[in-house]
Amino acid sequence: VATSEQFNKTFIELVIVVD
């Protein structure tokens, strides 16, 4: 199970890639 921290980190990284 991914923790909120891991999820947030992945989400931020995805946003950076998209941007």
From Swiss-Prot:
It comes from Daboia russelii (Russel's viper). One of its GO terms (biological process) is proteolysis. The keyword Repeat does not apply. Its cofactor is Zn(2+). Its main location: secreted. Binds 1 zinc ion per subunit. Residues 10-19 form the Peptidase M12B domain. Keywords: Blood coagulation cascade activating toxin, Disulfide bond, Glycoprotein, Hemostasis impairing toxin, Hydrolase, Metal-binding, Metalloprotease, Protease, Secreted, Toxin, Zinc. GO terms for molecular function: metal ion binding; metallopeptidase activity; toxin activity. It comes from the Eukaryota. It is an enzyme of class 3 (hydrolase). Expressed by the venom gland. One of its GO terms (cellular component) is extracellular region. Its EC number is 3.4.24.58. Belongs to the venom metalloproteinase (M12B) family. P-III subfamily. P-IIId sub-subfamily. N-glycosylated. Catalytic subunit of coagulation factor X-activating enzyme, a zinc-protease enzyme that acts in hemostasis. Activates coagulation factor X (F10) by cleaving the Arg-Ile bond at position 234 and is also able to activate coagulation factor IX (F9) and protein C (PROC) by specific cleavage of Arg-Ile and Arg-Val bonds. It catalyses: Specifically activates several components of the blood clotting system, including coagulation factor X, coagulation factor IX and protein C by cleavage of Arg-|-Xaa bonds. Has no action on insulin B chain. Heterotrimer; disulfide-linked. The heterotrimer consists of 1 heavy chain and 2 light chains (lectins): LC1 and LC2. It is found in: Secreted. This is Coagulation factor X-activating enzyme heavy chain.
